[in-house]
Amino acid sequence: MLLSLLVIIPFLSGIFSFFSFRFQKNIPRWIALTGMGLTLLTVIRIWFFEDYYTYQIQSYTHLSYQLILPWISSFGIQFHIAVDGFSIVMLFLTLFLGIIAILCSWNEIKKNEGFFYLNIMLVLMGTIGVFIAFDLFLFFFFWEIILIPMYFLISLWNQKKEDKKKCINIANKFFIYTQISGLIMLASILLLVLNYYINNKILTFNYDLLLIQPVDKSIEYIIMLGFFLAFIIKMPIVPFHGWLADFHERSPYCGAVDIIGALLKTAPYGLLRYNKMLFPNATEQFAPIAIFLGFLSMFYGAWVAFSQVNIKRLIAYSSISHMGLMLIAIYGGNEISFQGLIIQILSNSISTSALFILSGQIYKYLKTQDISEMGGLWTNIYWIPGFSLFFALSNLGIPGTGNFIGEFLILFGIFKEHPLVSIISTIGIIFSSIYSLNMIQKIYYGLSKHDFPKFFLNIKEFWISIVLIFALIFLGLIPQKILNISFESIHFIYNFSKRIQ
Amino acid sequence: MIINLQELIALLPFLILLLTVVIVILSISYNRNHFFIAFLTIISLIVSLCSLYFLIAIVPIDITSLFHITKRSILYISMIIISSIATCVFAYPWLLKYAFNKEEFYLLTLISTLGAIFLTISNHMASLFISVELMSLPIFGLIAYSNSQKYSLEASFKYLVLSGVSSSFLLLGISWIYAISGNLSLLCLNQIFSDLSNSEKMMVLFGIIMVLMSFFFKLSMVPFHLWTADIYQGTPASVLSFFSVSGKIAIFSILLYFFSYFSVFDNKVIFLILSLISFFSILFGNLMAIFQTNIKRFFGYSSISQIGYLLIILLVSKDEYFFSVQTGGIFLLNYLCTNIVYFGVINLFSNSCDYDIDSIHLYKGLFWVQPLLASIVTIVLLSLGGIPITLGFFGKFCIFSIIIKNHLWTIGASFLIGTILGLYGYLRLIVNMYLNPSEQSFINDIKKSNFWLCSPSGILIFISGIMLLILGIYPNPLINLINSVQ
């Protein structure tokens, strides 16, 4: 029952915060924050007191901590949620960023607060659901459910009043991209399930059952491709990245942006959990193409980020570039690089979100996102330049931060399998340092273009940044804590995907 | 022709409606009383709905050679009757303001309902033709009921002419089939078809295609769709909730009956025609819906695509009878509920005005004035688009699994593209409701009428909307119900 609370609490708190809006404008955010806090407590409770490790009994994954309720029996669909170490880590990340998102939007959202927090809570609920669903239908259900509140978040709470129309267009673009990805995934899931049905005469969407029965070789590749496409559109990897930059540019800079940090991470999670596990042979065959796509988006993202004049677009492209590295880690790596991937997911989300928050602060004072209009801000602003420098450096992977550990483990892991791939990826990281430093240089150093008034960072944002910095340093200094949590699941995922072939 | 008691019981719901028609006619000629007639009509429809319960024990049953009732037809009949009830409930407040004769509305609705439910059970070409006509003739009157309004007469006239043409096609087709088979029963068609020579087969096939064309006209599939948007625009909203549902459910049920029993339809030509029609209906309906600014026209185009999805079921209904009936049931129930809510809401707003409130921009910012109502409309639109937690998602899911199970890849492609295009259209309506209201007076008018939930139409809208949500989250009862009627 404890597990179902992970979904129920965010949902109910969203509903309550929507209705409490009528009474007083401040209540919704408190309810949302309390809801997140309670969910976090639940996760901690599960983490400390339950034996959630994944272990293996004769090639059958058994998650000792799970909840199975019959749902739509005639289709063999169950409400099957379970938690293993990998999920726990992702849940911590989601909830951490969720709380930060709520804190960030604390004073920023000045209209329709109730509806805003309802949407945020629904997005978080969907994300949590994606991480704990172990029924493919349920997984798809949550995967799709995120889109609607996300659509509202983009289209309704933009920064400027005048470009409402543009926001709706971008929201539509986002929706169409993700809808295509969703439909492709639905098709692949159905193919997978029907294939299982033809072989065993059991109609089921159960992940564990589908896992032990290998897919027919003839269609394995097609199904794998469907899943892959669905995930990389959401991730996003280069040919399908069109929505991300616009999306970031327009989304409300506090609340939604941080959620993106968690939301985008559903895709690498899915790739590892579903693609790697369900289709080991096809994945192995497909690996060179995936690695190539990873390179493409890594270099392309970095180069395009270099030429951006809009801060948020720059950060978005840098995020695309890092996603490329993650894709390479998933397809080219071994167990070590998977563990690096987890650290990288965590620290990259945190540092990217922090950069977004700071860029939001800059926007708040300067009313522009255009880098060319800034310059020499170091003399005008307290704290922000220092923080930005830290997060930018962390983003490019400086030792002492989580990103360094992540990148190091990823490259180390890949080097054992494909040395050349690892070497080329290292070159990609050089570019990321170039655009990061370029950004810092153009915004904060040099002469001021205008005569800006001096200002302080908000006390709330200040503490948020401090917390984020500590999180990154924690990841950088003691990554073993995180690796311990996820070790068993990652070990299992790696072994399972290798053992079958 | 001797009818025994059991057959009479089977005819009970029909007889109740017939009796009501007679009473309504007599009452109109003796003394007009709007409230009495509306009340009588609704009650008799409910009674006839309840009397379907007695049929469950005795079906399947043949009533003479004209009708054949199965459990499945009970399901469809109940859907049609529900849509008629909804129409009468919606129409009552609308008719209160209507200047001319009000009572004939119920008469026309009843007769058309009767035609529709006879159509779902007809098993003979003669009863088929008569039922189709009985169903569509009163609709001319219903469409033209608000004849003082713009487009109303035009729509009625258009439908009259085109429906006449389609009926003549139907008749022509029937006579082609009769010329070869010498029998008007639907069941004999199957038997005869296997004994025929090739040239004769061609003729029967031609006849069948003619009949199908007439049906596709009634379902407004591409390429017989050109009338749809205009007629939707000119028809009052309360009539639309009936017009859009009952005829389509009735014709779909007869098509499903055709396609699930007869080996005639294994024919490649018919398969090709059906897939082409479905392919283009999905694409075209969704594509055109995007550009509409009138929400009644919008629903017209969207219904083309919805029925287009439904046609996919027919392609496989012979091999997968069980599953396709289940899918059809889910999809049609979704269609019924969405229709009731969609047109119910339009009707609700239109009651305070002289004309139908059917322009998109008038609904801008509805959410901030009427949150509950706007949420229900959002659910409906999401359900039409097939987003999880709504019933429409399960309809989409079932149809998608049919496509994949049977490897209908071309249709699958159009399904994918159509769904995405459709979603774009639905999202446009949805986000429109959540924008900040413009300064126009309409939205401010609504503020006064805050008690919509207390009126009968409000309750109906609320129940249908919630049904979509509940069945979307937990569709088991519905699936069990549909499985139990097979």
UniProtKB/Swiss-Prot annotation, chain A:
Q: Which reaction does it catalyse?
A: a quinone + NADH + 5 H(+)(in) = a quinol + NAD(+) + 4 H(+)(out)
Is Transmembrane helix among the key words of this record? yes
Q: What's the top EC group for this one?
A: translocase
Write the gene name. nuoM
One GO molecular function term of this record is:
ubiquinone binding
**Which residue spans traverse the membrane?**
1-21, 30-50, 86-106, 115-134, 139-156, 174-194, 222-242, 252-272, 286-306, 314-331, 341-363, 374-394, 420-440, 459-479
Q: What is this protein called?
A: NADH-quinone oxidoreductase subunit M
Q: Which compartments is it annotated to reside in?
A: Cell membrane
Q: Where is the signal peptide?
A: none
- Membrane topology note: Multi-pass membrane protein
Classify the main location. membrane
Mind listing the UniProt keywords for this protein, alphabetically? Answer: Cell membrane, Membrane, NAD, Quinone, Translocase, Transmembrane, Transmembrane helix
Instruction: Report the sequence similarity comment from the record.
Output: Belongs to the complex I subunit 4 family.
Curated annotation (Swiss-Prot), chain B:
**How is it placed in the membrane, per its record?**
Multi-pass membrane protein
| Presence of keyword Membrane | yes
Alphabetized InterPro entries for the sequence:
NADH-Q_OxRdtase_suN/2, ND/Mrp_TM
Where do the TM regions start and end?
8-28, 36-56, 74-94, 104-124, 125-145, 160-180, 204-224, 239-259, 270-290, 298-318, 329-349, 374-394, 407-427, 459-479
- Could you say which enzyme class this protein belongs to? translocase
Subcellular localization, per the record? Cell membrane
The answer to whether the entry has keyword Translocase is yes
Output the Gene Ontology terms for molecular function.
NADH dehydrogenase (ubiquinone) activity; NADH:ubiquinone reductase (non-electrogenic) activity; quinone binding
Q: Which reaction does it catalyse?
A: a quinone + NADH + 5 H(+)(in) = a quinol + NAD(+) + 4 H(+)(out)
The entry's family comment says: Belongs to the complex I subunit 2 family.
What is this protein identified as? NADH-quinone oxidoreductase subunit N
Q: What organism, scientifically named, is this protein from?
A: Buchnera aphidicola subsp. Schizaphis graminum (strain Sg)
